[in-house]
Amino acid sequence: MSLPRAVGRFIIVGSQVMSKAFVQAYKQMIANAAQQSTGQAAASKSSTAVRRGEMTIQEAGSILNIKPESLEEGELEKRFQKMFEINDPKKGGSFYLQSKVFRAHEKLKSELDQKIQEQSPAKPTSSP
């Protein structure tokens, strides 16, 4: 086989392989986009909070070792006090970790207050 013929064959085979790979990658991109659009609505609230620098509910629960689904005010306060005391800088703790604990408590407390408001029926206002 001559050199020009081998180079030509190499170019043809290479372009066939590249075109097949491109088509396959394009199909995968379309499939990923379709799959992502279905899960995007659920993740949009969480990703918005992360972009703004806010702590997510899952992260707050992880910091205080509380499951956000089974959130109770007494348990929240107990865990907060314990973690806040452990991370007190005056006792050799970390101010950064203490602030993370505080922000986690703040986030879970607001979530708990929101749940309580949603569960309690709206009180009718009496007009004179």
From Swiss-Prot:
It is a peripheral membrane protein. The keyword Repressor does not apply. Residues 117-128 have a biased composition (Polar residues). It is found in: Mitochondrion inner membrane. Disulfide bonds: none annotated. InterPro entries: J_dom_sf, Tim16. Residues 59-113 are annotated as: J-like. Heterodimer with pam18. Component of the PAM complex, at least composed of mtHsp70, mge1, tim44, pam16, pam17 and pam18. This is Mitochondrial import inner membrane translocase subunit tim16. It comes from Schizosaccharomyces pombe (strain 972 / ATCC 24843) (Fission yeast). The lineage of its organism: Eukaryota, Fungi, Dikarya, Ascomycota, Taphrinomycotina. The gene is pam16.
